[in-house]
Amino acid sequence: MERFPDYINVTMPSHFYPDDGKWIQEMLAKLRVSTRAKITGEYSEVYQAAWDEEPVSYRKDNAARRAANIRLREFVVEYQEAAQGYTAKPIAVNQP
């Protein structure tokens, strides 16, 4: 468990690229504690799956980082909007 500067405990995923550590902590700190645990597990799963799927050894790190980081970034953006009350505009239904 690592210490984030504002004294929030951020548990890091079991699989991640060390250079991404600070960014991952920043993203996870934006989430609720209950959500963080699930997302760190899923981050590790996506990272490991992308690592295993890449056949070229020197491309494994990049493929794994890219897949896991894109997923984390997209989730955090959508989660923050939902947590702040933003919703999509309802679909208009034609009334006869």
Question: Which stretches of residues belong to each language-model region?
Answer:
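C-terminal alpha-helical interaction appendages
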Residues: M1-P96
